[in-house]
């Protein structure tokens, strides 16, 4: 069992069933590393969360979230994360309509009672002193309407406020008579046979699109045109007074069929420029992308099975050589086999089937890395990757190459890690025909990675092993390279953590043929 615990304490008006008292219904963690016996302020509404870092209720992080009478978060106090032992506090302020108008940066508090509520004025003074800044907060302003939209946002820092540097927003509709608010309409047709035509068809009628205008601290403006369904039609960036437009053209189902880039709009819309600068998409009858084209490249086509899983794909280079790339999944939808084949992309007799695979009873008598494939006939398969899950029956395909090395970990592995990737085989592209790299992944009783054994292109084996703290952080990582000449090189990484499970120190050492070559730490660099 993985040793992780999180306790939550909700403090407000509690209605307890008969026979249950507050003492038996609530569990309060006894202490954390820096702040013993932490509880929230009893005169406030709060939620207390304790996250253990070592599987016990002695060491960890306590977070108390305070709320007002309407359940709105007003203050968050965290204990056990600061190396000095002080609390970390943050404030949130709302207006009468419950909109967040100010958020303060997280900073250290001088509060003497761990995780106790800090009065608003006191917390503000402490945060300004901590950051040595009169404005360590972000301000937001809204329209006066109850559902008012955001009008301005000013980032933290007194310097920004002195310069009135803020990000501003305003809202309008498209209008051809106004600068930067006009937009074009297009005639377009992207067909299933991959023929297409796109042309400009004049200006959009005024009021067709809603426009949100954002202006940052440097005066740069962004115009976003959306239709009545909230779908983006045009994104316009104003650069030195010039418009850089990106149009998103959609079909009647709201699916994007073309993206017209700023370079295309600058060069002019014709067939050659569309080929060079536009993104194009085609959909099948089930609204899945059946073909796509990126600027300057050929078409890429996709075919799916009855479970809507991608089974075949082909790019322009594959089309020239007459091959396709295939993907086969198991019954849980996990990708098991990837490779190339000589099937035609137009051959979709299998598309009404659920294409899947399962481990064969006789693993060595299958061309699919130990799997039997169902629902499709693959012609001349060439495997690129094979994944194995849930167990280690596949190991008989690879002899002793991927055997678990217990001497490296000192413990046994979980024999049936359900839902985990347990092995992988990858082809070496450009190497000897049939060459591949095989891997086995072993897990401990908590399903944490315990050891990876992998062959390499030099004919040797790499063994990566892990040891963990009680809180599931990596304490030791060791990589051993076993070479064909019988020698070995090893790397070792040691980690220590603070009470909040953050890396405190990291130590690295390297050995070759039993001799230590160098030794480093993350803070002291070279040690010996």
Segments from the language model and where they lie:
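Beta-strand elements of repeat-based all-beta scaffolds
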Residues: 22-528
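Bacterial Sec-dependent N-terminal signal peptides
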Residues: 1-27
């Amino acid at each position: 069992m993985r040793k992780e615990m999180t306790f939550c304490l909700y403090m407000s008006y509690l209605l307890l069933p008969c026979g249950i008292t507050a003492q038996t219904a609530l569990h309060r963690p006894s202490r954390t590393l820096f702040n013993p016996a932490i509880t929230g302020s009893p005169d406030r509404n709060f939620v207390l969360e304790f996250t253990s870092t070592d599987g016990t209720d002695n060491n960890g992080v306590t977070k108390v979230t305070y709320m007002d009478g309407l359940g709105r978060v007003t203050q968050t106090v965290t204990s056990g994360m600061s190396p000095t032992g002080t609390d970390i506090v943050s404030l949130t302020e709302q207006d009468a309509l419950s909109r967040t108008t100010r958020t303060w940066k997280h900073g250290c508090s001088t509060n003497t009672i761990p995780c106790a509520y800090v009065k608003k004025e006191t917390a503000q003074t402490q945060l300004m002193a901590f950051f040595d800044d009169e404005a360590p907060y972000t301000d937001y302003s809204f329209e006066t309407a109850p559902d008012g939209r955001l009008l301005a946002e000013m980032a933290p820092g007194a310097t920004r406020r002195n310069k009135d540097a803020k990000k501003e927003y305003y809202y309008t509709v498209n209008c051809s008579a106004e600068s930067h608010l006009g937009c074009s309409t297009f005639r377009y047709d992207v067909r299933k046979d991959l023929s297409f035509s796109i042309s400009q068809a004049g200006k959009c009628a005024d009021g067709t699109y809603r426009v949100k205008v954002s202006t940052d601290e440097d005066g740069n403006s962004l115009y976003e045109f959306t239709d009545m369904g909230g779908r983006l039609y045009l994104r316009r960036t104003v650069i030195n007074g010039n418009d850089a437009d990106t149009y998103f053209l959609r079909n009647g189902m709201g699916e994007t069929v073309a993206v017209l880039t700023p370079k295309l709009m600058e060069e002019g819309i014709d067939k050659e420029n569309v080929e060079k600068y536009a993104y194009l998409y085609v959909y099948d009858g089930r609204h899945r992308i059946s073909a796509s084209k990126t600027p300057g490249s050929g078409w890429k086509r996709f075919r799916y099975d009855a479970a809507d899983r991608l089974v075949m794909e082909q790019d322009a280079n594959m089309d020239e050589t007459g091959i396709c790339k295939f993907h086969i999944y198991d019954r849980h939808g996990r990708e098991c086999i990837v490779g190339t084949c000589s099937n035609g992309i137009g051959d979709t007799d299998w598309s009404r089937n659920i294409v899947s695979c399962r481990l064969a009873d006789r693993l060595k008598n299958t061309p699919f890395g130990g799997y039997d494939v169902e629902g499709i006939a693959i012609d001349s398969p060439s495997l690129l990757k094979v994944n194995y899950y849930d167990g280690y029956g596949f190991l008989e395909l690879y002899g002793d190459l991927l055997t678990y090395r217990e001497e490296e970990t000192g413990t046994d592995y979980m024999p049936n890690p359900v839902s985990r990737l347990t092995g992988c085989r990858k082809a070496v592209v450009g190497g000897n025909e049939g060459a591949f790299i095989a891997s086995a992944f072993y897990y401990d009783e908590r399903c944490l990675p315990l050891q990876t054994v992998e062959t390499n292109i030099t004919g040797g084996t790499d063994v990566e092993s892990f040891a963990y703290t009680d809180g599931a952080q990596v304490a030791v990582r060791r990589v051993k390279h076993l070479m064909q000449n019988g020698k070995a090189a090893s790397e070792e990484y040691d980690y220590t953590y603070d009470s909040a499970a953050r890396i405190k120190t990291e130590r690295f050492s390297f050995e070759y043929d039993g001799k230590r070559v160098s030794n480093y730490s993350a803070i002291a660099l070279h040690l010996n």
